[in-house]
């Protein structure tokens, strides 16, 4: 297995580069070992994905956003050139800041994925693009969203991610668009579970919104779904990959306190108006995996079980030293 860091590489970065003009590229993701290009590999999902893909025997080129700016068409074509499959983890994820930087958010979340899709189509490489539950939310509902339900983002971040989905599928109809939600690792980063762990270690009560409901998703489980797609047997198109069940942020916070042995009664419910933000948040974006399962993607386990394992993994890792921070 090879894990190749993109830093300092040139167009000849593969350990076993393909000869110019060969015809062995594969858009179908049904072979055991693949050459995987990961964009946005410096982020929470990208880091775990790079490690797990290499552990499964794939040759991996892990590119941070500074090493491959997906808004740069030339850079994208250069790095995609010899890959069997590209997994796009690069995104503008600062939901509130996107309200003040809509052009930048659109460039990264819509133009960039379109560039990747066009480059992959040109060389017959597979493409897996990660999207979000925030493409939904404008409709008042309380039942999980299926892949073909009407979209309706309520903020600029969600609108740019929806535009990215459309750009990907327009340029490469056989791409995989994988929507996920409320992703966390729980270590030393700034995700919701990591934040709740830090607050649980302190004293006093905290107020957490109970009127935002979604699908908390553990990074490790999401990565498993992405690698299942690489392994083959999943139909292309839009898929949902989120841990099963329904949770509010309040529910997720209480469960995190319980998992670390803190008193969950310290977590108190409140409304979103208690914590006003520049970008509106959707009240309900639970993702259903039913159609995705029919397409061949194994549904992810219940969010509470995943959260317990995530916290246990963090505790085990910190016994020997802290986890790397995740931006």
Swiss-Prot record:
The positions annotated as site (Could provide a fine-tuning to achieve optimal pKa matching between active site and substrate) read 132
Which classification does the entry list for the species? Bacteria, Bacillati, Actinomycetota, Actinomycetes, Mycobacteriales
Give the UniProt family note: Belongs to the dTDP-4-dehydrorhamnose reductase family.
**Gene for this chain:** rmlD
- Spell out the reaction equation it catalyses: dTDP-beta-L-rhamnose + NADP(+) = dTDP-4-dehydro-beta-L-rhamnose + NADPH + H(+)
So where does dTDP-beta-L-rhamnose get bound? 132-133, 182
A single GO CC term for this protein reads: cytosol
One of its GO biological process terms is: dTDP-rhamnose biosynthetic process
**Protein name per the record:** dTDP-4-dehydrorhamnose reductase
Q: Which organism is it from?
A: Mycolicibacterium smegmatis (strain ATCC 700084 / mc(2)155)
The record lists NADPH as bound by 44-45, 69-70, 91-93, 157, 161
Q: Which GO terms describe its molecular function?
A: dTDP-4-dehydrorhamnose reductase activity; metal ion binding
Please state the Enzyme Commission number of this protein. 1.1.1.133
């Amino acid at each position: 297995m090879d894990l190749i860091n993109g830093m300092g590489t040139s167009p000849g970065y593969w350990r076993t580069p393909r000869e110019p003009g060969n015809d062995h590229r594969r858009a179908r993701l049904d072979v055991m070992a693949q050459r995987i290009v990961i964009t946005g590999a410096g982020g929470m999902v990208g880091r775990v994905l790079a490690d797990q893909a290499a552990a499964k025997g794939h040759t991996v080129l892990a590119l941070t956003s500074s090493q491959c700016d997906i808004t740069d068409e030339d850079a994208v074509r250069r790095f995609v050139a010899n890959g069997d499959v590209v997994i796009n983890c690069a995104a503008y994820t600062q939901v509130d800041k996107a309200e003040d930087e809509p052009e930048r958010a659109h460039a990264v979340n819509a133009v960039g994925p379109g560039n990747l899709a066009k480059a992959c189509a040109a060389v017959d490489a597979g493409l897996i693009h990660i999207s979000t539950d925030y493409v939904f939310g404008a409709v008042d509902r309380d039942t999980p969203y299926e892949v073909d339900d009407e979209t309706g983002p309520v903020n600029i971040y969600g609108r740019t991610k929806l535009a990215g989905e459309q750009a990907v599928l327009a340029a490469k109809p056989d791409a995989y668009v994988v929507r996920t939600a409320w992703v966390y690792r729980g270590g030393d980063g700034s995700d919701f579970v990591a934040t709740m762990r830090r607050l649980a270690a302190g004293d006093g009560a905290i107020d957490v919104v109970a009127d935002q409901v979604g699908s908390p998703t553990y990074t490790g489980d999401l990565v498993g779904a992405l690698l299942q797609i690489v392994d083959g047997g999943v139909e292309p198109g839009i898929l949902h990959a989120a841990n099963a069940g329904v949770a509010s942020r309040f529910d997720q916070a209480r469960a995190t306190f319980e998992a670390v042995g803190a008193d969950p009664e310290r977590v108190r419910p409140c409304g979103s108006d208690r914590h006003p933000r520049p970008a509106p948040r959707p009240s309900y974006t639970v993702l259903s995996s039913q159609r995705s399962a029919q397409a061949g993607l194994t549904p992810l386990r219940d969010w509470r079980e995943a959260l317990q394992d995530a916290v246990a993994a963090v505790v085990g890792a910190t016994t020997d030293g802290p986890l790397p921070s995740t931006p």
